[in-house]
């Protein structure tokens, strides 16, 4: 039994894929905490000058959500991101790092969403012009940590969903 973790840069279908795969496989889905937090507590964002305190609150909430959904226990949950995103976001924007963000959970497999799809901006996305650069940071971090992963390349959502489901089936996860 393994958890499946969707990870990658902004606007690569992670949340939609997590929900669709969870539905297709009848598995619980742990949503990304940041979007929920921002919608509730920071409804008129200025992401260019995003406060460190807000990031810290998001990081704590994400780790708490992971614990709630059994990230550190054996299981077959779907996670719409994990601490890798906190590590890259925190280091990039604040020079922040926390060992807790990279503490491995139970056996998991990462589906890294490549920025091959069209970019859709919204009030929370500010790094659209840096997607390739940030994608490489995910690849480097996954490699450095020795975490198992496959990159999802399909540029259209439906095709990426089929790609993810095919990989999950082939790997038996």
What positions do the PLM features span?
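Active-site flanking residues adjacent to catalytic metal/cofactor-binding acidic residues
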Residues: 31, 79-81, 113
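Pre-Walker A (Motif I) flank of P-loop NTPase domains
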Residues: 1-3
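Conserved lysine of the Walker
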Residues: 14
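Conserved substrate/cofactor phosphate-moiety recognition/catalytic segment
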Residues: 19, 23-63
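Conserved nucleotide-sensing/catalytic segment adjacent to the nucleotide-binding pocket
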Residues: 44-96
């Amino acid at each position: 039994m393994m958890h499946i973790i969707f990870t990658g840069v902004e606007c690569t279908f992670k949340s939609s894929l997590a929900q669709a795969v969870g539905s297709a496989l009848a598995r619980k889905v742990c949503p990304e905490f940041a979007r929920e937090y921002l919608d509730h507590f920071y409804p008129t964002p200025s992401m260019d000058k995003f406060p460190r305190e807000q990031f810290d609150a998001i990081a704590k909430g994400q780790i708490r959500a992971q614990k709630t959904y059994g990230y550190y226990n054996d299981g077959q949950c779907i996670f719409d991101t994990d601490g890798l995103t906190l590590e890259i976001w925190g280091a990039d924007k604040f020079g922040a790092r926390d060992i807790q963000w990279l503490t491995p959970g139970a056996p998991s497999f990462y589906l890294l969403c490549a920025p091959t799809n069209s970019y859709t901006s919204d009030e929370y996305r500010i790094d659209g012009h840096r997607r390739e650069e940030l994608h490489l940071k995910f690849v480097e971090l996954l490699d450095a940590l020795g975490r198992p992963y496959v990159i999802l390349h399909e540029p259209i959502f439906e095709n990426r969903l089929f790609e993810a489901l095919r990989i999950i089936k082939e790997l038996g996860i």
